[in-house]
Regions:
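Rhodanese-like catalytic fold shared by cysteine-dependent sulfurtransferases
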Residues: 1-31, 38-71, 80-116
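Short, surface-exposed ligand- or partner-binding patches at beta-edge/loop junctions that are enriched
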Residues: 75
Length: 116
């Protein structure tokens, strides 16, 4: 996996961001976790086909359901909540975890495929 950049948010300097176009071309190789609310997941911005909804507030209780062997990309609306999720996973022993830069806003701006 090529890194796009370190997170631009100084509070998450240990988090690597991946560009939506890079993610779109590798969705079969990735575990995509959407940390938005259920209404956002099916709302106007839709969600990435094949992604799994696991809200940010559920993450602490359900992190152990994710495999540390998988490459995980966290997704949200703009990239802020997913950066929090990525940071939390890193703090809890996950190594191959990333944040989708720009969230679903940028995904939609690029015109990439969504489901609602």
């Amino acid at each position: 996996m090529e890194f796009t950049s370190k997170s631009e948010n100084p509070h998450f300097s240990e988090v690597w961001d991946l560009d939506p176009k890079e993610i779109q071309s590798k969705t079969a190789e990735l575990t995509l976790i959407d940390v938005r609310r259920p209404d956002e997941f099916v709302g106007e911005l839709g969600h990435i086909p094949g992604s799994t909804l696991l809200t940010l507030d559920q993450l602490p209780a359900k992190l152990d359901t994710l495999s540390k062997d998988d490459t995980i990309v966290f997704v949200c609306r703009s990239g802020a909540r997913s950066a929090q999720a990525t940071s939390f996973a890193l703090e809890n022993g996950f190594n191959d975890v990333y944040n989708m830069r720009g969230g679903m806003l940028l995904w939609n701006e690029y015109g990439l495929k969504i489901e609602k």
